[in-house]
Structure formats: structure tokens, C-alpha cells
Amino acid sequence: MSKTEKAKVYFTDFHTIAFGDGLPTKLKKLIRKAGIGSIDMKGKFVAIKMHFGELGNISYLRPNYAKAVVDVIKELGGKPFLTDCNTMYPGSRKNALEHLECAWENGFTPLTVGCPIIIGDGLKGTDDIAVPVAGGEYIKEAKIGRAVMDADVFISLTHFKGHETTGFGGTIKNIGMGCGSRAGKTDQHSSGKPHVKEKLCRGCRRCQKECANGGLVFDEASRKMHVDAEHCVGCGRCLGACNFDAIEFDNNAANELLNCRMAEYTKAVVDGRPNFHISLVVDVSPNCDCHGENDVPILPNLGMFASFDPLALDQACVDACLAAAPMPGSQLAKHLADPDFHDHHDHFTNSTPESEWKSCLAHAEKIGLGSREYELITL
């Protein structure tokens, strides 16, 4: 695409006609029209990056949408698999066994989606690869799940929603944060070094074996591990080594810095190979699907979007959301009724005032991830 040419973003709404095509069929038509068929997938491994939802949360994308994408990829001769990487925090997705069980319980199985499910950074979240970030200002090498990078073709399938830290969770967050290994997520979230929660430490020393820098010291008297701040480099390897959630990083990176790091991680994932992106603005909960609960949607179901440009796709989804009326009774509507919230045209700031969400899009454009200028093509 030339610098003067706008990125193309394709759109269709969620309306259907009685006894006509269902939403999975509409999604198939959308991605075909958007040009997914131009990617050579014959005999190639195709990663479909999505979020399977935390246990207790039911606002994540239904497996039916994943199945629709899988069907199209198979028609094109590809070998698809669904993937996500483990979380840096305790929950139902912190290791591959629990992550898969969570995915199955939430409806994602080979039977329902038509392809295997592979956790991208392995059993403990330590199976990653260092990927250079071209033009990165904050990240020189991104720690990406190995299975994600081993794929020949990369597809993202995103549930576009609000987010308590980044303002919104779109394509860039799905890719950048989602494809980071446990250490990679730590790399983005934390500005410091870990600490050991002594009550949970069993003194097994697994974490110490993973540390290449002498950053962990075992106290023989207490039989507990401690962080040596002088030697710890904050790489996050110890996080995946602990089976007892005794090692923790503070989520203390400033929101603007977090947003910029996510954009750079996204660039590491998509650079140099075929990629295509899908985003569904549906069940727009105020918080991330990483929560074990979900609140009522802050915005109506707006539609399905697809593009080869991840930045243009996020921008189009943002613009659609900002133009929509808030849902009555939602967190956003309650905030708008508060006289302390003055910018009635910025739903994401009004929902999460400290998010600095615009910094993600601006930095993504600066580093060449894509374009914020787009042509919206409605089906």
C-alpha cells in the first residue's frame, strides 16, 4: 500500500433476515470480500489468535465465530489452529493445562471450532522466542510465544470491548499483549522487578534454576526465596517457573508506556509474514475478558470489521464506538451522568479516565504498524 493510499476496512452489521444467512455466514462473506483469499495458505500452518475468556466471564466471542474463520481457512488449503498465550497473573489461564480446560469449558474444543487449540507459549508460559522489533523505541526484542511465531500465516480474531487500563481492547491489544509469553506480558506491564510472596513460596528452588543472572537467593533460615534486586534484570522467567503463584510483578507501567509497548509487540508478531485481522464490536463490556465476570455492555452491538491493516482496523472500530450512543444503565452511562466527566464524545476516557488510550494508536502509526487513515467499505 502506498503512503497516499488509504487502508481498506470492510464492515457488516449484525442484522439478519428471517430464514436468511446467520451471523457466522455473514462473517465468512465479510472476510472473503476483505481479501483473505489472496493469502497463499495451501499446506501452511495458520495461527488464529483469539481470547478464550476467563472462567466466569461470558462476554468473549462465541466459538461459532472462530469456526466460521476456520472453515474459510480450510477452504483455502490452510492448516488452522486457535492460539493464545498464558497470563502473567493467577487465574484460569496461567498455564497450558488450565488454559485448555478453561477454553474447553467456555466452548472451544476441536469439535466445536474444527481445528486444534494450541497454547502459544507452552506448558508454563516459558516457551517463547525473542523477536526483534524494527523501529522499536521501548522494546528491542519481544518475547513471543513460539507457536505463534512458528505459524506461516497469522490471523487475529478480536473481541472489541472496553478495558480498565488501556481504554479499549482491540486488535493491537489482542496481538501485542496476547501473543506475549508470560515474560513478554511482564515486559509490557511492569516497570520494575518481581517480589516473592513468602506465604506461597514452598522453597522448591525451581525459579532459581530458571534465573540466568543470579537474581534469586534462597534463605536457608526461612526456607524462602528472595529477589536480589542488584542482579535481577526483570526478565520474568521466574514467573513461569513457579507452580505456586509465589512470584509476582507489579502492574506499575504508566498507561501510556504500556500502550506503546503493546504496539511494538504487535509489530514484532506481524512483520515479515502474511497477516489478516478481524474485529467484532459485540457485547462491549467495560472491562477485559480476562476478568472472571462481565458487566452489562457500555455500547450496542455495532458490527464486524476486517482488514489487512491492524491499526486501521482498531481506528475504524474506535470511530464506530465513539459515534454510538451509550447503553442506558451501563457503567459508561452512569459516568456520563456524573458532572465530573465532561468529555461526552470520548466514551473510552469517560469509562476509564486514566487509560491514555489514544497513545496506542499514535505510537502504532509512528513505528509503521499501519495507517490510521482508512476507507470503510460496507457490505
Where is each model-derived feature located?
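Extended, low-polarity segments enriched in aliphatic/aromatic residues
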Residues: S2-M50, L55-N57, L61-Y65, V72, ...
